[in-house]
Amino acid sequence: MSYSFQGLLNRVNESAIVNTLKEYTGLNTPKWTFNDIPDLTGKVALVTGSSGGIGYVTALELARKGAKVYLAGRNEEKYQKVMKQIHDEVRHSKIRFLRLDLLDFESVYQAAESFIAKEEKLHILVNNAGIMNPPFELTKDGYELQIQTNYLSHYLFTELLLPTLRRTAEECRPGDVRIVHVASIAYLQAPYSGIYFPDLNLPHVLLGTFARYGQSKYAQILYSIALAKRLEKYGIYSVSLHPGVIRTELTRYSPTFALKLLEKSVFQYLLLDPIRGAMTSLYAATSPEISKEHLNGAYFTAIAQRGILHRAHDDAFVEELYRYTHKIFEDLKYLAPSP
C-alpha cells in the first residue's frame, strides 16, 4: 500500500496533535499506578498546598504507604478537617500540620524553622501549592501573587530545608531523597525572555496574568534543574512536572467565560480528576525508576511520562536565575551568601 506525500503529512500532523494533547492533558494510558508506590515506612514527607486537589491526594497516598506526612498550608482549621479525612481513610496514618503562608516570606522562614525543630530527616519534599491567574496584586513583601506563591516562597522554603535534606541523604541511596516541583506546561506562556529580570512582577506585560503565571512556572522548572546540578553530589534528586489539566480550585481566578467554555465543550473531557492528576507527582516523588534511570533534573508530563522542555535554556541562564533569586533572600537576611 502506498501513501501520497500529503496523506503521510496528514498522518504525521495527526500524530503530533494527539501526542501534544496527551502531554497537555494526561489522557495517555498510565504505565504507573498508586499500587507501584513502594513502602515508605520510616520516611518523612512534606507536601505544600495539600488541603485539596492533587496535593491532598499526594499526601493521602504517601501516608497510605507508611510515610509520616506534613501538610503545609495557611488555614489550620481547614487542615484539621483534612487530617481527619486522611485518618478516617488510613487508620495507621502519621499526619502533621505545618503552618505555611507562601504570601509571607517571614511565615516561610518560620515554617522551615518549625519543621527543622521537629524533624531530623526529610526524604520527600513536594512543592505543590500554587495560584493561577489572579488579578494583579502585590504581597506584603512587594511581589506579585503568582511569582511569590509559585516560585519565590518555594525557593526560600527549599533552600532553608536543604541542610536537613542533605543530612537525610547521607543515610540513603542516591535518588531516594527527592524534591518535586509541581510546575505546568503553562511555562510556555512566559514572556519571550523566559524570565524578566528587570521586574519579576511583570506589571505591564501584554498578556497580563497568563504571562505572569507562565513565568512563575518556568522559574520553578529552571530552579529544579539548578538544584539537580547542585545536589547530585549529595545523592539528592530534584525533578519538575506538568500534572495534566485538572479539575481543582486552582482555576478559581480564571475568567468565567473561559471556564464556561471548558465546561460546555469537548475540552471538559480533557480534564483530569485529582486522583489521576496526582499520579505524576507521586511517580516523581517515589518511583524507583527515577533513581535506576538517573533522571535527576528531569521534567515529567502526565501521566508519569518523561517530558521534553519546549523552551531553550542553557546552564548560564539557569545559574543566573538561581543566583538572582538567592540574592533577593540574602538581602532580606533569610539566606547566607551563596557559595
UniProtKB/Swiss-Prot annotation:
Coiled-coil annotation: which residues? none
The answer on whether this UniProt entry bears the keyword Membrane reads no
What the entry lists under InterPro entries is as follows: NAD(P)-bd_dom_sf, SDR_fam
Recorded hits in Pfam families, A to Z, give:
adh_short
Q: Which CDD domains match?
A: retinol-DH_like_SDR_c_like
Tell me which UniProt keywords the record has, alphabetically: NADP, Oxidoreductase
Record: residues binding NADP(+): 54, 78, 101, 128, 213, 217
- The positions flagged as active site in the entry are 213, 217
One GO MF term attached to the UniProt entry: oxidoreductase activity
Q: Which Gene3D superfamilies match?
A: NAD(P)-binding Rossmann-like Domain (3.40.50.720)
> EC number(s) for this protein?
1.-.-.-
> Which cysteines in this chain are paired by disulphide bridges?
none
- Quote the PANTHER family the UniProt record gives: RETINOL DEHYDROGENASE, WW DOMAIN-CONTAINING OXIDOREDUCTASE
Family according to the record: Belongs to the short-chain dehydrogenases/reductases (SDR) family.
This chain belongs to the protein called Uncharacterized oxidoreductase C736.13
